[in-house]
């Protein structure tokens, strides 16, 4: 029973860590002007623009 609890805690820790860092950086490595806005919208952001050769996604809000 104690082994199952340890495994569950380890899996929970890994899941939370992966989920936290999955959207850590919302900038793509190279910006393609035609697809930047589409890619950002597909990921759940309001819009996207190419800034300094990087696709910057803008969230909903102000």
From Swiss-Prot:
UniProt keywords, alphabetically? Amidation, Calcium-activated potassium channel impairing toxin, Disulfide bond, Ion channel impairing toxin, Neurotoxin, Potassium channel impairing toxin, Secreted, Signal, Toxin, Voltage-gated potassium channel impairing toxin
**Cystine crosslinks:** 31-50, 36-55, 40-57
Q: Which residues are listed under the site Aromatic residue of the functional dyad, important for the interaction with Kv1.2/KCNA2 channel?
A: 58
Protein name per the record: Potassium channel toxin alpha-KTx 10.1
Is Transit peptide one of the keywords UniProt gives this record? no
Hey, what's the signal peptide range on this chain?
A: 1-22
| Reported function | Blocks Shaker B (Sh) and voltage-gated potassium-channels Kv1.1/KCNA1, Kv1.2/KCNA2, Kv1.3/KCNA3. Also inhibits small conductance calcium-activated potassium channels (KCNN) and intermediate conductance calcium-activated potassium channel (KCa3.1/KCNN4).
Tissue specificity: Expressed by the venom gland.
Q: What family classification does the UniProt entry report for this protein?
A: Belongs to the short scorpion toxin superfamily. Potassium channel inhibitor family. Alpha-KTx 10 subfamily.
Feature type site, description Important for the interaction with Kv1.2/KCNA2 channel: 34, 38, 42, 46, 51-52, 56
Q: Which residues carry this modification: Tyrosine amide?
A: 60
What Gene3D superfamilies would the database entry show?
Answer: Knottin, scorpion toxin-like
Say where the protein is mainly found: secreted
Originating organism:
Centruroides noxius (Mexican scorpion)
Cited SUPFAM superfamilies: Scorpion toxin-like (SSF57095)
**What are the recorded GO MF terms, alphabetically?**
potassium channel regulator activity; toxin activity
Source domain of life is: Eukaryota
- Propeptide position ranges: 23-28
Any one Gene Ontology cellular component term annotated for this protein = extracellular region
Query: Beyond the main fields, what else does the record say?
Result: Negative results: does not inhibit Kv1.5/KCNA5 and Kv3.1/KCNC1.
Domain comment?
A: Has the structural arrangement of an alpha-helix connected to a beta-sheet by disulfide bonds (CSalpha/beta).
